Amino acid sequence: SGKEADVFVVRCGSEIRCAKVYKEAMKRSFKQAVTYQEGRKVRNSRRNRAMEKGSKYGRKQTEEIWQNAEVDALYKLAGAGVRVPTPYGCIDGVLLMELICDADGDVAPRLGDVTMSAEQAVEDHRLVMLYVVRMLCVGIVHGDLSEFNVLLDEQGPVIIDLPQAVNAAANNQAESMLSRDVNNMTNYYGQFAPELLGTRYAKEIWELYEAGKLDPDIELTGKFHEDEHSADVNAVLTEISAAIQEEEARLERMKPDEL
């Protein structure tokens, strides 16, 4: 069980798979869900307004989007070369997917439940940083990455739990979420390989992303040099003012046809 779902091992014909049963919003302990949903596109304007108002219909739509976000992310990340469970579909709040197993055929342990050598920690950390980069290359930040959301099978780390995954280009908190994800993983692996604790992968990755230089197979260094140039305060204030005016105009447009 987790903070947003209960997970079961189930039989599907001759196959053993994993069924993730999402909890209702009021029963989830996942904090600040609205922050994670920022930037998720909803093309239907009526649906979007209902979600913003929090009506019964709107809450139902929000739940569907929350659940479908994980399925969409799993397919997208698998295609990008990130190791994730294979999804088989999501119906009525139940996500059916591949069961990740260890070398003995048992359910693979969470990363937080294993110990490892310094050499293995460095190698697995390198792989996880590679997966973070590949996620970002397709516009996704995990948003809740830690040793509790990574499984370890005989081939290495497998990333799980993605309903809160955010759109890197559309979510204002994407950089801070990526930084937290990277630092969580670095601090964990740093218990076994202390040399990792002095690295600055989060800053390096985000700078490359913003510069349009991030590549799925890029060789990271873990180093980052701060820009010592002064910020253009007037430009920042102008952008803030424009954003406020845009939001006020949006709210004004909504008034005549509220649900």
Give residue spans per PLM region.
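Conserved ATP-binding subdomain of kinase catalytic cores across diverse folds
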Residues: 1-107, 137
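A glycine-rich phosphate-binding loop feature that marks nucleotide/adenosyl-phosphate handling sites
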Residues: 93-95, 149-152, 202-208
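Catalytic activation segment of kinase domains across protein kinase-like and atypical kinase folds
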Residues: 13-24, 30, 101, 107-114, ...
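Amphipathic alpha-helical transducer elements in NTP-driven molecular machines
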Residues: 64-71, 122-125, 175, 179-182
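Regulatory N- and C-terminal appendages and interdomain linkers associated
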Residues: 1, 119, 127, 134-138, ...
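Catalytic-loop of the protein kinase fold
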Residues: 84, 137-147, 152
